[in-house]
Amino acid sequence: RRSNKFNFLPNWLDKESNLFLEEVNHSKKSYYSFKRGALIFVDFGINIGSELSNRHWAVVLNKNDSPKSGNLTVLPISSKEKKFSVMIDEVIQQKSKRFLLPILDKIGFDYFSIIHYALTEITPFDLGSAEEIYQELLIQYGDVYNSESAKEIYDNGVGMEKVENTTKKLKDLVNHYQRFNKISYAKCDQIKTISKDRIIYINELDPCGKLKVNNDTLDRIDTKLKELYLKD
């Protein structure tokens, strides 16, 4: 029977080649420093036998990570519960909302600021079908509106383009994170050390690495790792 790994192998080899080139061209890099318990989205590549392959979330185990370190030790995460797995608190999609909702709020405020500034400081115009949305935003943001900051957001007419660009990035993130709406389990029998270059960010607004499991989850992971790897 043909393994479905062959379907993913060409794309992985292409990505791996680009990572090697990046390694040669940028030998000295400064990396993001991750906290213990951080959740990161990792491309584990295509591997042999029952070694984990493809893209999975993972829990960072390092206690003292550094921007100078290019590696992390992690536990991959799966939606399937196995013998040596530990359930993580809260689904990843729910964790992402604490970071994505403030972005949505900022988009709403910037959109209102641009429209209100144009209406009151430049020239009134008919909003048409957008009038109802504007009135809702006026109720929500009218008290915190500031004409000086609104002028900066308006940015000589290009502010709306920036808001639309941010909106698209947020939609991409929402579509990405809504896939991870199931209870997840840290695979304690698949502990791995990876390069930070394997971490995937959808765009610069992605909270990957900022999401975190709670201390109770980390304690249960510690207990399971001791059970698996340390002598009594």
Predicted segments with their positions:
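Short beta-strand-centered aromatic/proline hotspots
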Residues: 53-64
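Short, conserved beta-turn/loop elements at beta-strand boundaries and strand-helix junctions
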Residues: 63-69, 80-81, 193
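Enriched for short, Lys/Arg-rich terminal
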Residues: 75-84
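Short aromatic-glycine-enriched beta-strand elements
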Residues: 56, 69-75
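Short, charged beta-turn/beta-strand-edge "cap" motif at the junction between a beta-strand
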Residues: 45-51, 65
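C-terminal terminal-subdomain/extension
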Residues: 1-14, 23-24, 32-35, 85-232
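Short coil-to-beta transition motif at edge beta-strands of beta-rich domains
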Residues: 33-46
